[in-house]
Design a protein with these regions (language model features):
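Internal alpha-helical scaffold of NAD(P)-dependent oxidoreductase catalytic cores
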Residues: 25, 62, 91-92, 115-120, ...
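Rossmann-like NAD(P)(H) cofactor-binding subdomain of soluble oxidoreductases
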Residues: 53-138
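Short, well-ordered alpha-helices that flank and scaffold nucleotide-derived cofactor binding pockets
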Residues: 20-24, 87-91, 114, 275, ...
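Short, charged/polar "capping" segments at the starts of alpha-helices
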Residues: 41-46, 109-110, 157
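NAD(P)+-binding Rossmann beta1-loop-alpha1 motif at the extreme N-terminus of oxidoreductases
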Residues: 1-58
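NAD(P)-dependent Rossmann-like dehydrogenase/reductase catalytic/cofactor-binding core
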Residues: 2, 162, 169, 208, ...
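A structural signal for isolated positions on well-ordered beta-strands in alpha/beta enzyme cores
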Residues: 7, 32-34, 100, 148, ...
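Nucleotide donor/acceptor-binding cores
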Residues: 3-4, 31, 71, 119, ...
Length: 322
């Protein structure tokens, strides 16, 4: 198997890392590379391209129909966008298409597999400390951990694992193949829950975890709940590589994706983080009080961004805490 065509669904911070890494191959005409988009989003991409680390890239923009039959589909969407994109994914995938989801959380592969079949899905994750600025997406190529992927069961060095390795090997994309991809995905999930969420409530950079015993206590509480659920599901997090217990190197001012979303007035992926853990906790009979509080706090911050608590001009309206 040789990968000669790649479609990226989702041209945000994660999708831009893949686009950046494969752009030289596309420019050399050794790879067909396109971003899947429709309507106004497609028009913006055609007009403005994607600005990555200060450089503007103009990828091909494909409809799902035009992307049908690509060798590799990279799904790099926000969690809330996935349900609306499942029809597009079904359209894109042919008998030969391999699908890699680089989305956060632990269930995007299952949701995609339910639509196209598990045989198409090559489990994967990405660790890239990218962020949006006024001039596009920025990340540090050197400190980025990159893409980790692998088969759930033997043979671990399958044809498609080798094909993806060959695709990434002579690019700037950092990658690693693992025989413990399920544990690696859950290890990243643990990082997201414990490191993304407390700082989002506080509104402070990641330095808060080392500078505040109180924020660390919240992070540790979230971690204990997640690890209890993982253990109940038979997931041995100790099998994840040591490098997977931490994220990419960042300054103490860094703001991870959940806080970036709140800063920008966007809704977050909290349903995929604490929301998923609350659901699994109920199914397994495991209490999740730290995640329940965190879930409702971040939902309330979303409501605040939506203007729900704008009481301008209501000074004379009596009310009380209920």
């Amino acid at each position: 198997m040789k990968i000669q065509s790649v479609a990226i669904l989702g041209a945000g911070a994660v999708g831009c890392y893949v686009l950046w890494g494969l752009a030289d191959k596309a420019a050399a005409n050794t790879l067909q590379l396109g971003v899947v988009a429709e309507d106004s989003r497609a028009e913006r991409l055609r007009q403005n391209g994607c600005t990555i680390n200060g450089q503007v890239y103009h990828p091909q923009v494909w409809t799902p129909q035009q992307a049908h039959g690509v060798d590799l589909l990279i799904v790099a969407l926000k969690y809330g966008a996935l349900p609306r994109a499942l029809d597009s994914i079904r359209t894109i995938v042919s008998e030969r298409t391999v699908v890699m989801s680089l989305m956060n959380g632990v269930d995007s592969e299952e949701l995609i597999a339910a639509q196209v079949g598990a045989a198409h899905v090559l489990p994967a994750l990405i660790k890239v400390a990218s962020h949006r600025t006024e001039d596009g997406v920025r990340f540090d190529p050197e400190t980025t951990i990159g893409i980790i992927y692998g088969e759930l069961t033997a043979p671990f060095d399958s044809d498609r694992v080798q094909a993806v390795r060959a695709l990434f090997a002579d690019t700037g994309i950092h990658f690693r193949v693992t025989e413990h991809i399920r544990e690696e995905i859950w290890s990243k999930f643990r990082l997201n829950v414990c490191n993304n969420l407390p700082q989002a409530i506080l509104g402070a950079g990641v330095g808060c975890y080392s500078d505040s015993a109180h924020i660390k206590a919240i992070s540790d509480g979230l971690r204990r709940e997640l690890e209890a659920i993982a253990a109940a599901k038979g997931i041995d997090l100790s099998k994840a590589a040591a490098a997977s217990t931490h994220g990419s190197t960042v300054p103490p001012t860094a703001r991870y994706s959940t806080l970036q979303d709140l800063d920008a007035g966007r809704h977050t992926e909290i349903d995929m983080f604490s929301g998923a853990l609350m659901r699994m906790g109920r199914e397994l009979g495991i209490p999740t009080p730290y995640n329940e509080y965190t879930y409702h706090m971040i939902k309330a911050l979303e409501e605040k961004n939506d203007g729900l608590f704008d009481y301008s001009g209501k000074d004379q309206e009596p009310t009380w805490a209920k």
